[in-house]
Amino acid sequence: MTPANAPAPSPATPSATPYGTLPPAATPSARKPLSLPRLREMHAQGEKITMLTAYDATFAAVADAAGVECILVGDSLGMVCQGLTSTVGVTLETMRHHTECVANGLRRSHATAWLIGDLPFGTYHESKEQALRNAVALMQAGAHMVKLEGGGWTADTVRFLVERGIPVCAHLGLTPQTVHALGGYRVQGKTEEAAATLKREAHELQDAGAAMLVLEMVPAALSAALTQALTHCPTIGIGAGNGTAGQVLVLHDMLGMNLGKMPKFVRNFMDGAPSVRGAMEAYVRAVKDGSFPVNATHAW
């Protein structure tokens, strides 16, 4: 028996949860949660926006802790997680599942990152109503914004979603879902005609209400010009030079987990980094200070 005058036992010291999972009572971040007004403010002030892909709770929480502002649950998971040869086979249910995983991780770690979910191939092509149903599914899974690929033909869909309260990130240049139609993973907008088309489509998407625009494998000079011209739609580049409003990389690429030939626009941030979080922090610093990407090395 415990003596009546015995001191009360000390509260148990919280211990790490098993299997590397996130503690449900993590210390809230001092940073304010990201929002569309804040992202527009960063763009207006010339502060670079950082984005990485993530597909599960732990990597998403680590990315947020490293200072990454936007997390993209990309359909690239089809290639880096599922082993597919393109993103075409990724389903809405797969995207919904991974979006929910990432959202859970961000919530449990009191994260501040802005979460974007990719609408996969075939989920917004049939009609605006189809796009709405599927965008709602990703928003209900925890996304703050949905992303869809395509040029001017998507403008009406973008407007339809925005009018119904769903923020949209558009995607021009190399659009991996249409890689077969494009003839492979090729730089887009190299000719005068192609550049003019990209400019027109970018303005159409901004006018439709797109709040962000990914530019993939677009010549650096063209990307910089588009960024200057789009006054209220920040551009996020991947293989598009350092003149965009922000940068995004696929998580596995920037951690050097690519067993094949590394894309030209990628830097392995694990080189010299003490940890995955350290690599992500190095990425954030490099984007913020303009040392990544380097046009002569990582762009066209």
From Swiss-Prot:
- Top-level class of the enzyme under EC nomenclature: transferase
Q: Which GO terms describe its molecular function?
A: 3-methyl-2-oxobutanoate hydroxymethyltransferase activity; magnesium ion binding
Q: Which GO terms describe its cellular component?
A: cytoplasm
**Which InterPro entries does UniProt cross-reference here?**
Pantoate_hydroxy_MeTrfase (IPR003700), Pyrv/PenolPyrv_kinase-like_dom (IPR015813), Pyrv_kinase-like_dom_sf (IPR040442)
The UniProt keywords, alphabetically, are: Cytoplasm, Magnesium, Metal-binding, Pantothenate biosynthesis, Transferase
Q: Where does Mg(2+) bind?
A: 75, 118, 149
* SUPFAM superfamilies (UniProt xref): Phosphoenolpyruvate/pyruvate domain
Domain of life, source organism: Bacteria
- State where the protein is found: Cytoplasm
- List every stretch annotated Disordered: 1-34
Family, as annotated: Belongs to the PanB family.
Q: What NCBIfam families does UniProt report for this protein, alphabetically?
A: panB (TIGR00222), PRK00311.1 (NF001452)
Q: What is this protein called?
A: 3-methyl-2-oxobutanoate hydroxymethyltransferase
Organism listed in the record = Polaromonas sp. (strain JS666 / ATCC BAA-500)
Whichever gene encodes this chain, its name is panB
